[in-house]
């Protein structure tokens, strides 16, 4: 009995499109979470300062260690398979395992997202538990989704093709930020709560449907062609020998860490990426503050809200342009160019000063857009590091999720250090403590101050605060760009070296990567 036409049409979608659509269901939740979770607990649930910082400190630790923990639990059998009855894991088995994991963890992510918007415990306890639950499921989803990027394709061209669809669907998901403005109301929270229920339901059902579709496509490909996946150039592949066997030995976590410590490109990359993660979250945390203190006299509230919203969508759209450049010039050259652009724009803004509203508006928006866009390109670099790790250590299978987790272990602290260092620098330079000063009319919703405002600062302090915000705005990207240009210059996995690694991985893996059905 034949399939009805909608089902047949869905099964006929390219795997690259189905894979990319998974980013939509994460994006519609995560952008709303980033924009409103602090304001919800500070302004609606009235969390106190001590509980806020305790929650953020525990979150820092959990956020750093859950990536390598989940990566190790997911991929340790790929480092040294312990086969049962002589059977191990093929490439197809690894991909199907990751798809099934996304089918479970995606809906759980949606449920943990809902837990933020209904008060069900004391504010401090709920803040801590919600952050840890949400970040745990987000980590599981991100690890398996990113690992599939390395497992589904080998060539840089095909990985940028996959990333293209991720950026496209992430941009669509970012539109939830614009929709949220129609429902956000601190005094009457019920409409925003209902909006979040709709988002969570759509995300959870989307994960269930898309992972089932991806699973059926992979299984149908094997039945139809007698191979574990589609070959990128349309050829037919053979089922590769399973992972495991008499030559596979047990690799402990300590041995794996020693292998990473000898992986020079990995070390230089995580040093650069730590700065990048810090800068991305610094921009997210202080974007509303910069709009408020540098531009509030020159732009309307609606213009500020529009700039805030567009800054979530534009990085994904920007990548639709940069990814073709990556296919032509390579990711290394494009990322280096973005670092140089960041440095040049920051120096230009420093020379121009804070009294040019149009230039300030462009710089604040472009700084966030280009920085976020660079973060999304770096996923492609990690997939190349996965290849190099496999070649250097002669693995049977690429431990993709584990390597993504180890990258996050080193770089994610930048996510928490960004607001801590930013508020400290502002307080050190201007004497303005965000936890003690009265908030002005908000342009956005990211507000890490408590519910009890102190008296407004004297008018004489205002110019100092404005000057402090301006110097923070320009000197942070200048410092980040200089550090990144140095570390990136030491990174050698590009050009001839990258081509050699790709060729060696093909030989080691007997070209057993799954194919993507191209558009």
Swiss-Prot record:
Keywords from the named record: Cell membrane, Glycoprotein, Membrane, Transmembrane, Transmembrane helix
Q: What is its main location?
A: membrane
**In what way does this protein cross or attach to the membrane?**
Multi-pass membrane protein
Its GO CC terms are: plasma membrane
Q: Which Pfam families match?
A: MFS_2 (PF13347)
Give the sugar-modified residues. Answer: 250
- Locate the transmembrane regions by residue number: 12-43, 56-74, 101-118, 127-151, 156-179, 192-223, 265-292, 306-325, 331-350, 359-393, 403-429, 469-487
| Annotated compartments | Cell membrane
Residue ranges, Extracellular side: 1-11, 75-100, 152-155, 224-264, 326-330, 394-402, 488-519
Supply the name of the protein: Transmembrane protein 180
Q: Which gene encodes it?
A: Mfsd13a
């Amino acid at each position: 009995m034949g399939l009805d036409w909608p089902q047949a049409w869905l099964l006929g979608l390219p795997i690259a499109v189905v894979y990319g659509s998974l980013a939509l269901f994460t994006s519609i939740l995560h952008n709303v979470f980033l924009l409103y979770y602090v304001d919800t607990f500070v302004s609606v649930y009235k969390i106190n300062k001590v509980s806020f910082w305790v929650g953020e400190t525990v979150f820092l630790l959990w956020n750093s260690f859950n990536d390598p923990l989940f990566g190790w639990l997911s991929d340790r059998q790929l480092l040294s398979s312990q086969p049962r009855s002589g059977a191990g894991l093929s490439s197809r088995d690894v991909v199907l395992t990751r798809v099934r994991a996304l089918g479970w963890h995606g809906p759980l992510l949606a449920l943990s997202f809902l837990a933020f918007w209904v008060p069900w415990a004391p504010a401090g306890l709920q803040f801590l538990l919600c952050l840890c639950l949400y970040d745990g499921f987000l980590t599981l989803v991100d690890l398996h989704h990113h690992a599939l990027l390395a497992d589904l394709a080998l060539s840089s061209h095909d990985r940028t093709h996959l990333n293209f669809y991720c950026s496209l669907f992430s941009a669509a998901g970012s539109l939830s930020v614009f929709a949220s403005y129609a429902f956000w109301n601190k005094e009457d929270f019920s409409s925003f709560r209902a909006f979040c229920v709709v988002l969570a339901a759509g995300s959870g059902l989307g994960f269930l449907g898309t992972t089932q579709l991806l699973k059926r496509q992979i299984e149908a490909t094997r039945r139809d062609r007698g191979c574990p996946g589609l070959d990128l150039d349309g050829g037919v592949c053979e089922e590769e020998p399973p992972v495991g066997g008499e030559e596979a030995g047990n690799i402990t976590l300590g041995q794996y860490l020693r292998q990473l410590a000898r992986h020079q490109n990995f070390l230089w990359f995580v040093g650069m990426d730590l700065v990048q993660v810090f800068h991305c979250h610094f921009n997210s945390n202080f974007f509303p503050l910069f709009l408020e203190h540098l531009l509030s006299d020159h732009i309307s509230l609606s213009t500020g809200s529009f700039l805030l919203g567009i800054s979530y969508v534009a990085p994904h759209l920007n990548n639709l342009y940069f990814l073709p450049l990556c296919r032509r010039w390579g990711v290394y050259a494009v990322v280096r160019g973005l670092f140089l652009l960041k440095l040049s724009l920051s120096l230009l803004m420093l020379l121009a000063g804070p009294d040019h509203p149009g230039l300030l508006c462009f710089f604040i928006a472009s700084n966030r857009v280009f920085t976020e866009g660079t973060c999304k390109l770096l996923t492609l670099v990690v997939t190349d590091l996965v290849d190099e790790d496999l070649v250097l250590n002669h693995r049977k299978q690429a431990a993709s999720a584990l390597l993504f987790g180890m990258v996050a272990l080193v770089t994610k602290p930048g996510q928490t250090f960004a607001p801590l260092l930013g508020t400290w620098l502002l307080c050190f330079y201007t004497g303005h403590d965000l936890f003690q000063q009265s908030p002005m009319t908000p342009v956005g919703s990211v507000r890490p101050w408590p519910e009890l405002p102190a008296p407004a600062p004297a008018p004489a302090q205002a110019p100092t605060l404005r000057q402090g915000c301006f110097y923070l705005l320009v000197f942070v990207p200048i410092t980040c760009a200089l550090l990144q240009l140095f570390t990136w210059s030491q990174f050698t996995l590009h050009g001839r070296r990258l081509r050699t690694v790709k060729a060696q991985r093909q030989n080691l893996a007997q070209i057993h990567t799954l194919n993507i059905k191209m558009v």
